[in-house]
Structure formats: C-alpha cells, structure tokens
Amino acid sequence: RHPSRDKLVQLCFGMRLDETKASELLERGGCAALRPYVRRDVIIAFCLNRGMDISACDDLLWGLGEETITARPRDRRV
C-alpha cells in the first residue's frame, strides 16, 4: 500500500526538500510529481522553494481557496 500524495508532501516539508527533490520523492512514492499546470501544486512548489513550513503553506493554500495539505477529510474546503 502506498502513502497518499498529501502524506508524501508532508514528508517533503519535514525533510525541507525543494521542488525538484519533492517531485522525485512523490514519483518514487507512486504519485504524480508536482505539476506546473495545477494551481495547488504551483503553490506547494512556491512554498517548498522558499523554505516555508507546512503550516504557512496551508495558510496560503486556504487563503487562495485551495485544499490544504494537513486537513482531515471532513475539514476540507469544498
């Protein structure tokens, strides 16, 4: 069984990876790399490349109307 993409993204933040290394980890974990045509992925890449922590990235995602990384399913924005 593979971890979810969001779990792998959380790991990327914990390991302080940049966009390139994060995409590699996602692919090795059986998920799609960060995609430049997906708004949420662009925001995540922006945060990773600037060394932001996961809570700051979640705040930015929420503020821009995107699904956060650490939200539980019932808390996710529709």
Where are the predicted features?
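Short, basic-rich loop-to-helix N-cap that marks the start of a DNA-contacting helix
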Residues: 1-14
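A short, structured loop/turn motif at beta-sheet edges
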Residues: 15-19
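Short amphipathic recognition helices of helix-turn-helix/homeodomain-type DNA-binding modules
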Residues: 21-54, 58, 62-70
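Intrinsically disordered, low-complexity acidic/Q/S/K-rich activation/interaction tracts characteristic
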Residues: 74-78
